[in-house]
Each structure stands twice: as C-alpha cells, then as structure tokens.
Amino acid sequence: MEKIADSGPVQIFLSRRKLLAFSGASLTVAAIGAPSKGSTQDVVASNRDSISDFMQLSAFATGHKNLDLNIGSALLLAFEAQKHDFSTQIKALREHITKNNYQDVEALDAAMKDDPLHPTLIQIIRAWYSGVIEDETNAKVYAFEKALMYQPSRDVVVIPTYAHNGPNYWVSEPASVDVMPAF
C-alpha cells in the first residue's frame, strides 16, 4: 500500500520583517483613512443647519407647517446632488424673505418673477407637491402617498397605484361585518 501525501494547509512563511512591514502598512492606512472627529462633527452640524433652513423655507413656500422631516432631508440631498450651490440659494431665498418681510408665498412669487432665485422656489414647491425633483420618465420618487398634492382629498380619492385600496392597504384592519350576508 502506498501512502497518500497529506495535502494539509498551505504553509505561510511569515518572517518578523514581513509581519512588521505589514503591520506598519495597516496602521498607516487606518490612520490616513479615518476621518478626524472634528471634521465629522462639523459636517453633521452644517448639514443640520441646511436641513433646518430648507424645512423653514419649505414651510413658508408650501404653506404647510407639518412637513415630514425625512422627506425634506431626502429632497434636500437630491437637490444638493443636482445643484452644488443649492444651499447658498436656500440661504439667499431666506434672506430675501426676511429682508422684504413677505407674509406669504404669493407675495414672494409676485415680487420674484424676474429674479434668478425664482426657479429654485418653484422647484422646491413642485418637489413637495409632486414628490419628485425631475421631469424624466424614470425619476426617483421621494414622496408618493405623502406628496402634498394628495393631502386635500386623501379621504375620498384613492392615490393612483396598482394596489386597489391604495398603498399599504393591507396594514390596517379590515372593516368588521355587522350583518353576515345571506346567500
């Protein structure tokens, strides 16, 4: 009988020099790749300020005070990805509203017809009412059932969907049957 050679685990030749070089390289990559705590906090704080500015401007522009913060955050991120100077446009719009003491969006709209910030105002209003920021066929939807255009008639009009009783209809309890039908 012949002995079959053992094909055990592959031997790894690791010398002290290789171990030291590998450890040093790993520590260097970890130190360079990790962001500092201060910079992360600054980004979060500035993002919080821009979300607050966007939500306040949105409340003024739409006339709705109880806007969904999650939808607002998603819309803001989408606008900022589309236009890199969007945050400065928001600040400029808020300063314009404060400086001229506009009471409602209709007065602001009438005064800003030829202003370069007018399209930004219209885009914000349109995004909250339609739930999208683009006109394309495959545009990303940020708000569907919570889009503002469905809110005034949500008790009588079913939101367009393939689900016959509206989105998430299966979540609520079905209506109880008081009298059983007779066949």
UniProtKB/Swiss-Prot annotation:
Biotech and industrial use: This enzyme is commonly used in a number of research projects to examine the electrochemical properties of enzyme-catalyzed electrode reactions, named bioelectrocatalysis. Available as a commercial product from Sigma Aldrich (catalog number F4892).
Post-translational modification: Predicted to be exported by the Tat system. The position of the signal peptide cleavage has not been experimentally proven.
A Pfam short name: FAD-SLDH
GO biological-process terms attached to the record: fructose metabolic process
Keyword list, A-Z: Cell membrane, Membrane, Signal
Subcellular location: Cell membrane
A GO cellular component entry from the record: plasma membrane
Signal peptide range: 1-45
Family (UniProt): Belongs to the FAD containing D-sorbitol dehydrogenase family.
Function: Subunit of fructose dehydrogenase, an enzyme that catalyzes the oxidation of D-fructose to produce 5-keto-D-fructose.
Subunit and interaction comment: Heterotrimer composed of FdhL, FdhS and FdhC.
Record protein name field: Fructose dehydrogenase small subunit
Upper taxonomic lineage: Bacteria, Pseudomonadati, Pseudomonadota, Alphaproteobacteria, Acetobacterales
